[in-house]
Amino acid sequence: STSRRQRQMCIRDRSGSISAFNFIKEKVKNLEITPAQLALDPCSGSCVITDVKTGELLACVTYPGYDTNRLANTVDSNYYNLLYQDLSNPFYNNATQQTTAPGSTFKMVTASAGLTEGIISPGTTILDKGQFEEVANGPKCWIYPSSHGSINVSEALRDSCNYFFYKVGYDLSMVNGTYNEDHGVEMINKYSSMYGLDSKTGIEIAESKPKQTTEFPITSAIGQSNNSFTTVQLSRYVTAVANSGTVYNYTLLKQVTDSDGNVLETYEPTVKNTMDNISESTWDAIHSGMKMVVETHEQFDGLTVDSAGKTGTAQQVPTRPNHALYVGYAPYNNPEISIATRIAYGYTSANTAELAASVYKYYFHLEDTSTLLDGQAEDVGAAANAFND
């Protein structure tokens, strides 16, 4: 066909040959080969969508997956062996078992702590000096040697300014004018616990335990150090951000029936805790900053539903790409759903932001479903591989 010939012309190099790289890239773009089949970075991901008003899990997705029908009753042994040997690890639930540092998606925790403890107010500005030199081996802002200038907490969320949150983490660590690392860790964990990041979410399948930081409050304040959470745990956290402080215990079950269809037991999410000590002005500052994040990311351009969110990247292995993360909610003024998504070794959060935008298009019927599910893979461009938070 003409379209097929055009595609082939696009992937030929100057000599007229089709390189192996371009050939494979085109196959992936046209959904003829899946990332899981390649088992190259990135080839796995997860996404959790939640009703922020009730805590109901609307979707808890791990990729790659498999056909459970072929493993029920009479097990298809050949299929099982293929899955078992698959280098993309389809048996591993990336939504509930994979833990990584949350990266900058954690910054709303630090903002909550700084604002509530009186370290900063919504209008307090901090000058980004590039490198934070109040501690040994001072960490740098991602924009170093440039600077974000003098910004407040909402703008710091918008710009994902590491220096701003280093300073908040440092000030949270002060005891009688002296820097105390243990106290800083305690303060950060106090607020991450309020968001439910100290415990499992309650789902009835295998879930890894969250790990709160035990050291380095300066880098912990930007979601690094040894903070480590699953996607479903980040979902519970951002759901609480969206609804201004209600933390839910999740369930994956709806009801149990007998063989005649009679309901024996029903299941609903329950409220774990409410964050009554967080002021309305604090929520306003956080929500405003998250809205500005979306406004500065082109992945959300053209969406007719306003949303708010936070990007994040986390390095786990120096020889592999960063993990990419995104948490957010929509609509902005009257939230219905939250989203938490991670692409392991996904380079940067531009890729997860693109995924979140596609979820919004699907949920709010902003684009034809068949185009979203059966069209081409998104082409986020070279900018998606640039470090920006």
Each language-model region and where it sits:
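Beta-lactam-recognizing serine transpeptidase/beta-lactamase-like catalytic domain environment
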Residues: 5-8, 12-345, 384-389
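Long, highly charged amphipathic alpha-helices
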Residues: 187, 285, 354-358, 362
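Short, charged, low-complexity patches
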Residues: 234, 348-357
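Short, gly/Ser/Thr-rich active-site loops of penicillin-recognizing serine hydrolases
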Residues: 263-265, 270, 357-389
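Intrinsically disordered, low-complexity acidic/polar segments
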Residues: 336, 348-350, 366
